[in-house]
Amino acid sequence: MATPPYPEDEHSRQAYVDQLGLLEEGADEVFEEILAAATSYFQTPIALISILDHQRQWFRASIGLDIRQTPRRDSFCAYAILGKGVFEVADATLDPRFRDNPYVQGEPRIRFYAGAPLATAEGLNLGSLCVIDREPRGPLAERDVAMLEHFARLVMARIHTLRSTNYIDEPTGLYNRLRLQEDVSLRLQRDGALTVIAADLLPLALLNTIIRTLGYPFSNDLMLEARDRIRAELPDFTLYKISPTRFGLLLPRQQQEETESVCLRLLRAFESPVVCRGIPIKANVGLGVLPLADDTLDGDQDWLRLVVSAADDARDRGVGWARYNPPLDQAQQRAFTLLTSLSQAIGTEEGFHLVYQPKIDLPTGRCTGVEALLRWRHPQLGFVSPAEFVPLAEKTALMRPLSDWVLRHAMAQLAQWNARNIPLRLAINVSASDMEDSSFLEEAVRLAKTYDIDLSALELEFTESVLIRDASAVGSVLLRARELGMGIAVDDFGTGYSNWTYLRDLPITAIKLDQSFTRDLAGSPKAQSVTQAVIGLASQLGYRVVAEGIETHDTFHLLQAWGCHEGQGYLIAQPMLPEQLEDWLRR
């Protein structure tokens, strides 16, 4: 049995099949009606709509045949796509190309075959519409050939209808993301270069709030209003809807110098709130710009992700619009890698360890306690600073498990020190998610019972940013912590609002002066005045004052003279492993 050859345009033909997604669709009633009409007209027991990929033929619809696919080498339709007209086989048992075919020798025992190519406007034959009989027949009459070609054209019309439906965003009636991706591919092949612009109108959090409070229909209507604004400002551009809050448009090669002008017009369109059902919604627009060239674009590169990344960058920096920035994208990719690895590390407890930085009583030099600090050695990236991974964790649900890990291991270490008669006060940093409810405190109480630890040896350190989410809820948790005997310290005091009012309203026991107070303290009279005043006022209010970042003897002596209670910093000691800390204490 001969193997059917591939047409000269096989690569383009296969690419078109892939673009249409014809192999992924389910049953279609229109296809089945066309086949029913074909079998009725030609009086055949079998009719098929077949689409060919590189190795197989797939039946998008069939009558008289139960199978969904066959190898391409066994396909009659693989010959039908080689020409422009109807392909006929009067008796397959007499044709050397087919007489040994398994579908001739066995079921469905094909004898007569006639197939009309399913041709695109570009002349690419995607497959065929064929009729099959189990008995030999003579050649089709001219009118019958014309009718078979007519049925094939009906199939192609339906394919294009399905294609159009698949490429439309239903709420807005605009072309969707799939159509944008196809248009980019086709225009790059034709013109060699273009620019993609993504307009993100609302942060996802704001969209979720709108949906939660006003409903999905309102959010759809809001996007319709936004669509109309863009159309009014840029009537000559094809607009695409590429996500719930994002629109896209293309600048052809000859208009790429107009990029800035187009972006400014888009931003101007949303200077005033979008009024939907009488409710004004202020858009927070970020525009991403990505020039593309056919000779530089990596075939595996997700350019849509890149232009969306640029839009997010523009909004985050408050600049309106921004071109794609590879270093920033690499940073975002690294952040994603870290978050993925962080989740795995929490589950396996691999790569984490704690170090402890001493605090001393400034008047006497005696060590009063330690601060537990988390360290992470990534298996591929090496040491990752907590200044990098903790802010990432705080934006996700990983922060609570991470805090629990620190609490669990720090209290276990404190228990070991207690057993060796090394009494220390342990400070642990807590995040906003730790303060949302009492579960973190409940875990601390459970661990204290397990390790026989007095909770008065535990101090919770939080930054002023913790209060931004829900100051009332945080206050309740802190009050409960204080009732349990824990110390409460405001960390990095001076970097936020430094609001003395919340100090009055919360059960604070200590404030930790940020190292911005102590940096270059000896050389700045103004810094000295501010720092001395803060120490004096905090002391009068009954707070223990701890200075961070002490690195010079001059700073140490100034703070000591002004009545600062405690200090920590590299002059005193760097963060250490438990055994190193014990050696330091003995010295």
Curated annotation (Swiss-Prot):
GO MF term (any one): cyclic-guanylate-specific phosphodiesterase activity
Top-level class of the enzyme under EC nomenclature: hydrolase
Reactions mediated catalytically: 3',3'-c-di-GMP + H2O = 5'-phosphoguanylyl(3'->5')guanosine + H(+)
GO process annotations (BP): regulation of single-species biofilm formation
Annotated function: Phosphodiesterase (PDE) that catalyzes the hydrolysis of cyclic diguanylate (c-di-GMP) to 5'-pGpG.
Hydrolase listed as a keyword: yes
PANTHER family (UniProt xref): CYCLIC DI-GMP PHOSPHODIESTERASE PA2567, CYCLIC DI-GMP PHOSPHODIESTERASE PDEF
PROSITE patterns to which the protein is assigned, alphabetical: EAL (PS50883)
Mutation effect (E464A): Does not perturb the oligomeric state and does not affect kcat
Domain EAL as annotated: residue spans: 335-587
GAF domain ranges (all copies): 28-157
Record protein name field: Cyclic di-GMP phosphodiesterase PA2567
CDD domains xref list: EAL
EC number(s) per entry: 3.1.4.52
